[in-house]
Structure formats: structure tokens, C-alpha cells
């Protein structure tokens, strides 16, 4: 329904804005005043003080005279300070910043930092392959901070880590009759995808259990459940199909706003009484009487609702 019959709301809003800005402009023009520059009055100097000022002017030496009468030993002191600072800079520059050392077991090289290498020839297998421990560390002598990068040889978990890096892992599905089934899944696969892939037509009857907890949410992914390579999922195939999403529907209970009405009214009444005690000049006798009656009414409503 339009605000004015026969006229669109857009036209009404436009004219209201134009009228508002026109009122602002008229108010600004009517109250605008020009700022005047401050007036400076020059006080004439008395004639008697002319001679004294001239004598004082002749008494004070000029800047050139001050520079001429300066101490001649200042140039010598400045030149000696500059020579001493240059010698200290050369001595500091001659200090070595890099150290190189070699040992029989490994090597250490440092140039503003350090690189350490420790050989592991004694622990190498007979075929000649070795897994050295390699440590690289860089240090900042000025900031005092250090960062290190360490690399160590991989052990028996190389295959599992490579499989997880590739994004696929192997899961063991264990049934009630102690039979197992090895499946390959991706980290981004969901529980419903696993059920549909390996239990086609039975995804509503299959229940997966991991570490004693039933996986109810079929939208969870393998990575969110923190499943690793070789993890065991217990499978139970029930005779009755489970209805998905029942727990979620029960959890989303609508909020009853009617229960919050009485506490909200009590809060408003308390705020009004606080204002009445702090600022009594704002409340007349009639307003105070109405506030008291409203408080009694709210109290009666609250008592009757909670008494039932």
C-alpha cells in the first residue's frame, strides 16, 4: 500500500529528501557569518628611548664577531674525534665474521649463521644406503633469533605417510562375524559415500562404529573424524532401516518466546524505577503513579502465570 494514494513511494521519498536538504541549506545560509580578521594596534615608541636602544644595539656584537672570537682549539678537537672514530671503525671491520671448521665425523660451516652435518656411516645398512641426520640452523647475531630446519631419515612409517599425503588411506571394516574387509577411501569422502560405495542398497541399514561411538552424522568426512591409515571401523547391518536426521530434528526445538515476555517486562519496569530514583525531576506525580500501577499489574500477571 502506497503512503500517498496515486503517488509511488519512490517519488514520495525523493521529494522528502529534497525538502530535507533544502531546509538544511536554508538553515545554514541564515546562520552563516563571516569571520573578521583581528585588528592589530601598533603602539608608537617614545622618542626618549631612541638613544638607549641605539646604545644597546651597538653594545651587542654581531654573529660574525661571535664566530670570529670562538675558541681556536675547537677545530683541533673535532679533527681528533673524527680520526679516533675512523680508527675504531677500521678495527671493528677487521674483526672476522665467519668461522669454518671441519671434523672427522661431519662438517660445520658458519657465515653469520651455522650449518651442522653429522654423518651416520656407522649406522648405515650393508648395501651402502644411509639415512643421515641433517640439521641446518641459521642465527641472526643482531636480533638474537634462531630458526632451524631439521631432516631425519624416514623409518617404517614411510608408506603410511606417503598414502596420507596422496589423499587416500586404507580402512578396515570389521563385521560381527570377525570378518574384515580392506577398503581404500579418500580423506574428503563422507560416511554416506562410503556406505553407498561399499554397501549399495543397504546404506540406510549399515551402521559404522569408530572407537565405541556410533557415527550418526553421515555428512562427516574421513579427515574430520581423524581416521588414519589402518583404522578399524566396526560395521553392523540392522534389519530395520534407520531414519537419517531424526536427532537433528529433535535438537532443533523452536524457542517459545512467550516464556520470555514476563522477564522482559520486569526488566523494563526495573529500568524505569531506576531512572525515577536517579532523575526524579523527569517524572511527575502522574507518571510515578502510572509506573506504580504498571508494576502491580506485571506482578499479578507473573504470579498467576507461575502459580499455574
Swiss-Prot record:
Transmembrane spans: 11-31, 253-273, 283-303
One Pfam family here: ubiquitin
This protein's GO CC annotations: cytoplasm; membrane; nucleus
InterPro entries: TMUB1/2, Ubiquitin-like_dom, Ubiquitin-like_domsf
Bilayer topology: Multi-pass membrane protein
Limits of the Ubiquitin-like domain: 169-242
CDD domains: Ubl_TMUB1_like
Region of interest (Disordered), residue spans: 39-162
GO-annotated biological processes: ERAD pathway
Compositional bias annotation for Polar residues: 63-93, 132-149
Gene3D superfamilies noted in UniProt: Phosphatidylinositol 3-kinase Catalytic Subunit, Chain A, domain 1
Keyword annotations: Cytoplasm, Membrane, Nucleus, Transmembrane, Transmembrane helix
Subcellular location: Membrane; Cytoplasm; Nucleus
Biased composition, class Low complexity, residue ranges: 103-115
PANTHER family reported for this sequence: PROTEIN C7ORF21, TRANSMEMBRANE AND UBIQUITIN-LIKE DOMAIN-CONTAINING PROTEIN 1
UniProt function note: May contribute to the regulation of translation during cell-cycle progression. May contribute to the regulation of cell proliferation. The membrane form is involved in sterol-regulated ubiquitination and degradation of HMG-CoA reductase HMGCR. May be involved in centrosome assembly.
Protein name in the entry: Transmembrane and ubiquitin-like domain-containing protein 1
